[in-house]
A protein has these predicted regions:
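C-terminal cap of thioredoxin/glutaredoxin-like
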Residues: 2-46, 171-236
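C-terminal region of N-terminal signal peptides and the immediate post-cleavage residues
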Residues: 43-62
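Structural alpha/beta surface segment adjacent to cysteine/selenocysteine redox centers
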Residues: 79, 84-90, 95-171, 206, ...
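Short, flexible loop segments at the rims of nucleotide/cofactor-binding pockets, characterized by
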Residues: 62, 92, 189
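Short secondary-structure boundary/capping elements
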Residues: 64-66, 96, 192
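A generic local structural motif
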Residues: 67-72, 100-102, 196-199
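Glycine-rich, low-complexity intrinsically disordered regions
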Residues: 11, 17-19, 58-69
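A short beta-strand-turn-helix
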Residues: 63-81, 106
């Protein structure tokens, strides 16, 4: 086969144009690199938000669901059935679920353990959770729990801090205010709330309220369906 002799290119002040194949190659490399970067960002986001850690081993799941210092609204002596709620005191959906949870507690008093975990998502929900934990240190968690939900329409969805409101609740409950302030401001209280959030994310919690019954996430469409699940757990 005869090869054509290379030609000496003519002198020109203009840069030589890239061939179409080289242009396509360069474009494809850029697109591929872009997709790699996007995929990395998405994966990092999943782990940061907790989506990548939803499947914790069974033993770890049990520890994450209920910690020794988790707040218990009521405790069943046999410990057979445990109902856990990850909540946000400022969450409107949590407020809407509150009467149903109270009815559930009434129906299963002494037979089901009810546990509350913090999962704050709103402007003042960390402060509200801190107030509840500070009240718990004086044996008044349930009282503050009720007060926060029953008055949520008054302080919720506010841009400004509602700390004074929460301290007012503490005074109304007759708490030692110096002791309340100490626990409220304690870094250990903030760490407890952050750990609740981390546990929730590891368990697949992405919003509130999220319920677990004996370790299984509850997904029901109505109150009767929830009652049926609790009855089945008690009968098992």
């Amino acid at each position: 086969m005869t090869r054509n002799k290379p030609r000496t290119p003519a002198t020109s002040d203009r840069p030589s144009a890239k061939s179409p194949s080289r242009q396509r190659f360069s474009k494809n490399v850029k697109v591929s690199l872009g997709l790699v970067v996007i995929a990395a960002v998405v994966l990092i986001g999943l782990f940061v938000l907790g989506g990548g850690t939803a499947s914790a081993p069974p033993g770890e799941r049990a520890d994450m669901l209920v910690r020794p210092d988790s707040q218990r609204l009521q405790v069943a002596e046999d410990g057979k059935v445990t109902f856990v709620e990850f909540l946000d005191f400022e969450c409107e959906a949590c407020r809407a679920a509150y009467p149903g949870i109270e009815e559930l507690r009434r129906l299963y008093e002494g037979r089901v353990t009810f546990v509350v975990r913090n999962f704050p998502l709103h402007n003042n929900s960390v402060a509200a959770a801190s107030a509840a934990e500070a009240a718990a240190a004086q044996g008044k968690f349930e009282d503050m729990y009720h007060r926060l939900f029953e008055t949520q329409t008054e302080w919720g969805e506010q841009e400004a801090s509602q700390e004074d409101v929460f301290f007012g609740f503490a005074e109304e409950l007759g708490l030692d205010m110096d002791a309340f302030r100490q626990v409220y401001d304690d870094p250990a209280t903030a760490a407890l709330i952050q750990r609740d959030q981390a546990d929730g994310r590891a368990l697949g919690v992405t919003g509130t309220p999220t319920f677990f019954l004996n370790g299984d996430k509850v997904d029901v469409s109505g109150f009767q369906e929830l009652i049926d699940l609790v009855d089945a757990a008690l009968a098992a």
